[in-house]
């Protein structure tokens, strides 16, 4: 695995790190991601200007990672959701979590549990059930809560629930008002109503991250394709 910096002005690409990155987050010229080092998952901060690389946390197994206002959120192999500041302070927020997504606008973590989806306020520490039923992923798109369940995408908005797509999605992402699905036949986008569906990449992908308006696609071995959104 290699992290490569490719300038928009057409200048030659340069290698920044020999990592297989997951969960990319670009903030203030610094790239945060998870990569394996020494047999365990680590959170790494990479300065995209000078190439300096720093290990911020060694966390055993990280199933999901997000960053908001200088705080790292990690889901471990024991289904525990934890927060850790960049200064090293750590606390456990929830247990029994199979997946989570950061809603940066509302400062909320949308946590998938065996009962459905719980919204956890990262400022208030309060939790609230926002969806009951089988769920694999959950995230906000504008005012709508989107839930991926069994390959379908369900929209919850204004007290109404509707299935907007049945494409066999294996992964769900949101960028602005754009809904993105990874399916066995390709990567699709649509609007929050499930309309105006467009294929933006052919083929099947296991993993995806969005950073700086670019969708990165690949597998557990690394990202192999990028698409500008």
Set out the residue ranges of the language-model regions:
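Residue position within the beta-strands of beta-propeller blades
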Residues: 32-35, 73-75, 110-112, 145-148, ...
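Intrinsically disordered, low-complexity regions in large eukaryotic scaffold subunits
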Residues: 170, 206, 217-219, 224-225
């Amino acid at each position: 695995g290699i992290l490569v910096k490719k300038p928009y002005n057409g200048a030659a690409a340069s290698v920044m790190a020999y990592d297989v990155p997951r969960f990319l987050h670009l903030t203030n010229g610094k790239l945060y991601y998870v990569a394996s080092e020494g047999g365990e998952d680590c959170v790494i901060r990479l300065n995209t200007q000078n190439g300096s690389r720093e290990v911020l946390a060694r966390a055993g197994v990280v199933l999901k990672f997000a960053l908001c206002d200088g705080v790292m959120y990690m889901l471990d192999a024991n289904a525990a959701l934890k927060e850790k500041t960049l200064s090293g302070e750590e606390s456990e927020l929830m247990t029994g979590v199979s997946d989570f997504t950061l809603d940066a606008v509302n400062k909320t973590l949308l946590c998938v549990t065996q009962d459905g989806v719980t919204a956890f306020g990262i400022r208030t520490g309060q939790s609230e059930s926002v969806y009951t039923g089988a769920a694999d992923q959950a995230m906000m798109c504008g005012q709508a809560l989107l839930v991926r369940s069994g390959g379908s995408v369900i929209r919850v908005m204004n007290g109404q629930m509707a299935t907007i797509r049945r494409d066999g999605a294996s992964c769900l992402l949101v960028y602005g008002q754009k809904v993105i699905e990874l399916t066995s036949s390709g990567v699709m986008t649509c609007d929050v109503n499930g309309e105006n569906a467009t294929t933006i990449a052919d083929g099947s992908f296991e993993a995806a991250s969005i950073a700086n308006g670019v969708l990165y696609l690949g597998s557990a071995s690394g990202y192999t394709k990028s698409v500008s959104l």
